[in-house]
């Protein structure tokens, strides 16, 4: 509660939507089964279970309420579709499907496209999910980066940026 303009959670941890989203996605896998989890089912959970409405979250939810289905929900009139909200919630997919690169990148896409459409935010989620899934079995950072890069378009800003950093590091 708020008292004297200060938040007092009485010793309770503060909510963290990045963790909360991953717990809801785990709930989706457990209740629907991995094969039934897709952008549409995740979109329904966004609307029913996820309170924040800021930035890409709000745009995606409002677009779904208007009748736009993912990935259009994350793409239409979304100034934040290139932001980082999706890749920071990919750990759950890597933990559910370790080493299963094709499955984990599909799940990252299904998740990210709801609020990031076809933007760079979706490419970032796919890139990160792929390297996280492989990291269970391979700790070579260059291998991980190359595997992640192999799953996104070379022309994407994410790919170009990662390759630029890798080149700078090499030099």
Regions found by a protein language model. Give the residues of each.
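Structured, active/binding-site neighborhoods that engage oxygen-rich ligands
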Residues: 1-171
